[in-house]
A protein has these predicted regions:
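Single conserved hydrophobic/aromatic residue that forms the stacking wall/gate
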Residues: 202-221
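Residue-level signature of catalytic and energy-coupling elements of molecular machines
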Residues: 9, 23, 59, 74, ...
Length: 221
């Protein structure tokens, strides 16, 4: 491996740095976009119990917010549960936009790497060609310099492709996964709105009944 780096010359180092950065992003996104983390399996059931309990503590909401990206959306909805349905929906949409932005973090950098890497490879190719032609003189040409120029050109061209292709594949994969996760969170959020709607209707009916029937000052929540 070291022999290849030496043969590729100094233009290969920007490509190596780019590849290391790309691998770091790919590993980080694989970890952060786990479905079990973004959308925990039993979270909706826990939220149903929390909403149905009628007594929601601040600590429970903060724990839900820290649980997962979906938990952030659910926590915002619960904080606004006594508001109108329109306000609940608006708060969910706003929280969803923030969560979506977090899920898309670094994907732009990954896309940039897939675009820049071939250009860096092309730059190395040009450097190699310059060195190649410098081997020619009026008295002939230096075979060693000629061979080194070809080596620099080819290794950098290949290096640019090797870095760009995985970065592009990873970008497309993560882009698709984010779309899937966002769609799933939207469905769960809509379900939560229906739950909130049921609770609001129940509370409204209970309040009407309290107005017409003496319940000893007790509120049904």
């Amino acid at each position: 491996m070291w022999d290849i780096i030496i043969a590729a010359g100094w233009p290969i180092w920007p490509l190596i740095a780019t590849s290391v950065f790309g691998v770091a992003i790919i590993l980080e996104r694989f970890w952060s976009l786990r479905e079990s983390y973004v959308i925990p399996q039993n979270l909706m059931e826990d939220v149903k119990k929390l909403v149905g309990s009628g007594s929601i503590k601040r600590d429970a909401v903060e724990a839900l917010r820290a649980n997962s990206p979906l938990g952030e959306i659910m926590a915002v909805a619960i904080e606004n549960q006594n508001s109108s349905l329109e306000i609940i929906k608006d708060s969910i949409e706003e929280a969803g936009s923030q969560v979506s932005y977090k899920l898309e973090r670094y994907l732009g950098a990954l896309s940039t790497i897939s675009t820049v890497a071939p250009l860096l490879g092309l730059f190395g190719t040009i450097i190699g060609m310059v060195e190649l032609f410098s081997s020619f003189t009026s008295s002939g040409h230096d075979v060693a310099v000629f061979a080194r120029g070809i080596s620099i050109a080819l290794y950098n061209t290949a290096g640019g492709i090797v870095v760009a292709v995985p970065a592009m594949i990873a970008f497309r994969f993560f882009r698709s996964k984010v779309d899937h996760l966002v769609n799933e969170m939207e469905q769960q959020a809509l379900h939560l709105v229906e739950i909130m709607r049921g609770c609001l209707l129940y509370t409204s009916d209970a309040a009407d009944e309290e107005d017409s029937v003496d319940l000893g000052g007790r509120r049904i929540i």
